[in-house]
Curated annotation (Swiss-Prot):
Its EC number is 2.7.7.85. Pfam families: SMODS (PF18144). Binds at least 1 Mg(2+) ion per subunit. Residues 145-167 are annotated as: Disordered. This is Cyclic dinucleotide synthase CdnG. It comes from Bradyrhizobium diazoefficiens (strain JCM 10833 / BCRC 13528 / IAM 13628 / NBRC 14792 / USDA 110).
Amino acid sequence: MSNFPSLRRDDRPDDPFADPLDAVLAELAINIQLPPGLHAKAVERYEAVRRYIERPGSPLEGRVACFYPQGSMAIDATTSTRGTDDEYDLDIVAEIEGPDLGPEALLDDLEAALESYPVSKVVRQTRCITLYYADGMHLDITPSRRRAPKEKEGEIPHAKKGTRSDPARYVPMNSYAFGKWYCARTPTEERFALALNRQLYEQAGIAFAAADVEDVPPQTPLIIKSVTTVALQLIKRHRNIAYATETGRIPPSVMLSCHAGHAARPGMRLAEMLIRQARWTARAIDDAAKRGQLLVVPNPEFPVERFTDRWPESQLQQTTYSRHLHTLANGLEAARTGDVQLEDLQEWLRGQFGDRVVTRSVKAFNQRLGRQVQSRQHGYTRSGGLFVPAAPAIIGAATSLAPVAARAHTNMGERR
């Protein structure tokens, strides 16, 4: 069996693949990204939808004041959706002008404007209209109304059609200001961004040879920009796997994004930031639970907007998620500080992030490690010496790690 190698501490340039745990997590992040081809397609679809709802004869002709991305699309934190490896949700806001006939009428107008749009299906939700594309992409378009002079500060409809038990109402919203706040707190970390984007584009078969951030050509934009956002994507992936079989509401992405923004500290390693974000949300939940309250997370730029207005609904809901996050952080800390078997790490990661994506990521890690050994660039050590695998368990021809016999305990901070 192969021990997870430790990092040789020296003056080598900091990069996301230098530490073995960071390297595996970086490969995981690459495998849950919106691929470059779909990223470009998402931008095209965004523009196409805008043109369609403003077309001559549309109920919204001349009424769309602005059209902008929100959520993960606005902060470059898109990942595959719950229970999938190749479906992606993207979010857009359409700010609507004109007579205010109520929240249900606002959704009615947007639904009518999107009638016959050429996608697999168009579905009306409680707060948005969702377009489902044949390739697995989902586009949520949320109508909003401006309620204050401040840019894009307003409200969105909450209207479940035909349901009297949940009256239609407007909900405060300023996702635009939140996105600006988040991006200001998570600046591009150049070395990290270039290393991961190069790997992402190469995996997609697209050349990426930028010398620095300023030289990145328009056709190869920096999809990955900061350690904070990559850790956020891994937190979201972890949540998606934890709730893959659940049918109810799950911890909202915008809540996790808000906590990530508060926890942001440029310059941290990926594993450290992932642990920091997991603990940040878990402890916020724990603090609320100790007071006998449900977690409340306001928009830092528009406090009347509550990112937790629909989740959690109970103490059980929030404490269950807190336990999931503590388990994740405990396991990562064990991997960073303990003598962890790589086979144990792989098995544990599958439980946290999903089988297929972990298998692909570990294979990529093995291949990268093999290339480094062959080119004498390997920087991992055990007890201070150069770590060179003696058996094919890490870099052998099969490149995947064989499972080991079950044990009563693992080194990952949990009982089997």
